[in-house]
Regions:
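Asp-box/BNR beta-propeller blade signature and adjacent active/binding-site loops
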Residues: 1-189
Length: 189
């Protein structure tokens, strides 16, 4: 549970990973939109976060959800968008893929850039020094409604590469539901 003063529609779309420390980490998307129809109590200017909770007792109990952060304690911002944990079979490292934005993100937007970062195996925070840009919006050719979210991940068992599949919805200014599909190959070695 999370207060509607922190996330106006609760939390949803969890991504879960078990760390090498045996800690279970769950990261959810939150929502910072004010809506009369939903009778929200959240305040204007509430920053957008991914929400973080963990269990050190095998999932019997979980901590109170808090804004997720880098391992140095710095909080980052993220819109209401799907994210994914992924553990590489090749190097055993845990990664997170998702959108990291500035504090101005509101609701679902913007859903760019798409980034990845390694997850600290002890506590479950992101290692800022591993932040890697996967894709970003081209302001010359792509709409501000671009969505670099709703992607799929798999690992090529022969090469060990991570393959990310993404349809760039909203890329075309004249048709927000039109989007081209892309495959990104990420070497993690």
């Amino acid at each position: 549970m999370i207060s509607d003063l922190k996330s106006s529609r609760g939390v949803d779309e969890p991504t879960i990973i078990v760390l090498k420390s045996r800690r279970i980490v769950v990261v959810f998307r939150g929502f910072n939109v004010i809506s009369k129809n939903w009778n929200t109590r959240i305040r204007m200017g509430t920053p957008p976060h991914k929400w973080f909770t963990f269990s050190d007792d095998g999932g019997r109990t979980f901590s109170e959800p808090v804004p997720w952060r880098y391992e140095n304690g710095e909080v980052f911002y993220s819109p209401a968008s799907i994210s994914r944990f992924f553990r590489s079979v090749v190097n055993g490292k845990a990664y997170w893929f998702g959108n990291i934005t500035g504090p101005e993100a509101y609701g679902y937007s913007p859903r760019y850039p798409l980034v990845m970062a390694e997850v600290d195996e002890e506590k479950g925070f992101l290692k800022k020094e591993t932040y890697t840009l996967v894709e970003d919006r081209d302001p010359e050719t792509e709409s501000e409604e671009l969505q670099l979210s709703n992607f799929s991940l798999l690992e090529d068992r022969e090469t060990g590469s991570i393959e990310l599949y993404l349809t760039k919805l909203g890329a075309y200014r004249e048709d927000r539901w039109r989007g081209d599909a892309y495959r990104y190959t990420i070497e993690v070695g």
